Design a protein with these regions (language model features):
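Phosphopantetheine-dependent thiolation modules in NRPS/PKS and related acyl-activating systems
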Residues: 1-39, 43-90
Length: 90
């Protein structure tokens, strides 16, 4: 896996899910909730906090897009990448 954002997102999600709920094969299309890592709402919140610690404040103003962003490891990585590129540097 060459995408550093996706690689870090997967590391974070694996840490939150733990080894018992980490699928044998994990990639961009792996679901964060049912059928994938089986994360509940509190664990998804942990993922959000860990991603904010790793990448900065990328979830502010997410609103109705939250369900789409938190669907798969890839959708989360894509949203983080888009929001970190859009943030002013300084």
């Amino acid at each position: 896996m060459t995408d550093p954002v996706l690689r870090r997102v997967i590391e974070i999600v694996k840490q939150v899910a733990g080894p018992q709920r980490t699928p044998a094969v994990v990639g961009p299309s792996t679901l964060l909730a049912g059928g994938g890592f089986w994360l509940d709402s509190m664990e998804l919140f942990e993922v959000i906090l860990a991603c904010e610690a790793a990448f900065g404040s990328v979830f502010r103003g997410l609103g109705e897009d939250a369900a789409r962003v938190l669907h798969t490891a890839g959708s989360l990585a894509t949203a983080i990448r888009a929001r970190t590129q859009a943030q002013p540097r300084g």
